[in-house]
A protein has these predicted regions:
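Conserved small/polar residues in nucleotide/adenosyl-binding loops
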Residues: 137-139
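Divalent metal-coordination and catalytic microenvironments
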Residues: 12, 50, 125
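A short helix-to-beta-strand connector/capping loop
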Residues: 118-123
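N-terminal catalytic cores of NTP/NDP-binding nucleotidyl/phosphoryl-transfer enzymes
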Residues: 26-84
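Active-site-proximal loop->helix
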Residues: 79-100
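Short, internal active-site loops enriched in acidic
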Residues: 129-135
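Non-catalytic terminal extensions that flank enzyme cores
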Residues: 1-44
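A glycine-rich helix N-cap at a beta->alpha junction
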Residues: 94-117
């Protein structure tokens, strides 16, 4: 659709990132009116990401370039508990040192594509492993 008013949806459409959108007019209006926040999560099962993650990384990059704030959610907690994602065998569990090494490797990938900091459109990186230590009082 070439009628997008938001720069993000326009770029995504021009680059054929969009297949379908539910209520694109409302989404376009939101993205045009104010800065938005979006996240994508990545498990820490390896010290780098494979090419299958490139679409998500580029979406976050364009999201930021259009003035919005991307969040990279590292799946340290998900990696600890395992997530077979419909596979027949459970994922091999990694120890804390391996997970930390993998997180650092993945972080270097994102630092090539996103600007991290405290500004309104600077990317944030957080880790769902931090949520595992929260008590009900903290939630």
């Amino acid at each position: 659709m070439s009628e997008y008013t938001s720069s993000f949806l326009r770029v995504m459409s021009e680059r054929n990132f969009i297949h379908q959108v539910t209520d694109w007019k409302s989404l376009d209006a939101l993205l045009s009116e104010k800065n938005m926040v979006a996240y994508i999560g990545f498990d820490c099962t390896a010290d780098s990401l494979h090419v299958g993650s490139l679409v998500q990384i580029m979406m976050l990059r364009y999201f930021q370039k259009c003035g919005h704030r991307p969040i990279v959610l590292m799946g340290g907690g998900t990696t600890k508990v395992g997530d077979p994602s419909g596979k027949d065998d459970a994922r091999q569990l990694l120890n804390d040192n391996e997970i930390e090494k993998n997180k650092q490797g993945i972080k270097t990938v994102f630092e090539k594509y996103l600007n991290f900091g405290d500004g309104p459109s600077d990317a944030i990186m957080c880790d769902n492993d931090e949520w595992l230590s929260l008590s009900l009082i903290h939630i």
